[in-house]
Amino acid sequence: MSATQAGYWYLASYPKSGNTWCRVFITELQRLAAESEPQELNLNRDLETGAIASSRHWLDDQMGVNSCDLSFAELDPLRGRAGESAWLFAEGERFHKVHDAFKSPDSRGRPVVSTAGCRGVVYIMRHPEDVVVSLSHFFSWPLERCVDYLLDPTAALVPGERNGGHQVRQHMGRWDQHVRSWADQSELPVLVMRYEDMLAKGAETFMALATFLGLPTEQGLVAQALANTSIDRLKKLEEQVGGFVEKPEGCERFFRSGRTGEGAEQLSLEQRKQLAKGLADVMERFDYGGVELG
């Protein structure tokens, strides 16, 4: 099968929901299937599943523009064109990370990612209470600010207008809006994976992932890839390379506890009520419990 026939996929998520874990698993499964004697995974060398959809260099290369010269209203409607060239289908770089919502307020009703040749999207989601705690450690923000962030309809990564950094603005909106933007869109096939199931039902959940993506589904391979990329193993691999390159400055480590339920332990009752009230419909839809609202 040619690279173009193989197509490509998106791995979409709200930040700190398990996207990197998913990418590492895909990398390891492919390595185990391809190498007779695979070497131990090096996080800073081997994790090359594809581009992040918000990469400024990648977008500029694909669209032939300087995105620093464009406003959000000018850039977002164009972003869906990126990837229409054959480069996106390069062998070995077929799984592209996305933190944007599927559409933005500035994209004029169009997706901010290319859908031409895309075979589907894996949407990874996590209990919003636990996302708050993980974001707090990742951004070095107080919990209160992270609660407000998940409830902010204008929330974005790299929010500055005409910012010249490595990534462009990624509109996410409220946590529930982000989930619905991907789970309910009808332009691409979608597999929704809950972080909680990745932990509690790993064999079943990652086998479903491999099947959806057309990756090797031999039970022994999937089990070995899962064992090699457990959260505890990833923490050790991060230590071995002296820190994961995707860890922001000021963050002690990228792979932290990986547990579920930290939000319920660390958030105040009022903060949990804020999330439950604001995100109730989507939390209930995906079986995420919260505090009772009296």
Annotate the PLM regions:
Residues 217-220, 268:
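Structural helix-adjacent loops and short alpha-helical linkers that scaffold large soluble proteins
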Residues 101, 127, 196, 228-231:
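Short, solvent-exposed coil/turn elements at secondary-structure transition points
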Residues 226-277:
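PAPS-dependent sulfotransferase catalytic core
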Residues 1-192, 256-294:
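PAPS-dependent sulfotransferase catalytic domain
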Residues 219-227, 287-294:
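Short, flexible loop/turn segments with low-complexity composition
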Residues 174-177, 204, 250:
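Generic alpha-helical secondary structure signal
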Residues 216, 228, 281-285:
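Hydrophobic alpha-helical segments
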Residues 18-32, 192-217, 225, 233-234:
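PAPS/PAP-binding and catalytic site of the sulfotransferase fold
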